[in-house]
Amino acid sequence: MLIQPSIALFEPDIPQNAGAIMRLCACLDLPLHVIEPCGFLLDDRKLRRAGMDYLAGVSMSRHVDWQAFEDSTPAHRRILASAHAEVLLPDFDFAPGDIIVMGRESAGAPDYVHQACQHRVRLPLVSGQRSINVAQAASIFAFEACRQLHWFSHLGDETRDDSIE
């Protein structure tokens, strides 16, 4: 049985990034956890614009805070995407049901989130570069997890819309 990875947004700041990640989750059939408080309303116009008409297809769980998120996901490994991690994404092995935790755009993740996550993983970047956009990073992490877990075979070709060129 395939159990897809999921993405968690820790107190997201920027609605456009959250909307782009929601669209990613809709397109890959990945659950999304939003850990509040957010720096915007979840019905924000900018969020809807970035997510377009894909938002209705997102399986989203909202959590009032980190503790509520932890309480609702006790059986899952939490993998923190962090620019400060020692383990590189290409060297990390994902497991079914892993939750990829993305920190705030403005401040990353606080120490208690680092400590609560079983693994911390970073993207390999050119020396001297700090990080990339959180939506881009979420996409890279999600695609690598899906690739490793053979999740793409679940999606099948019927998901393609050949009318779009």
Role assignments for model-derived ranges:
Residues M1-E165:
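Post-transcriptional modification and biogenesis factors for structured RNAs
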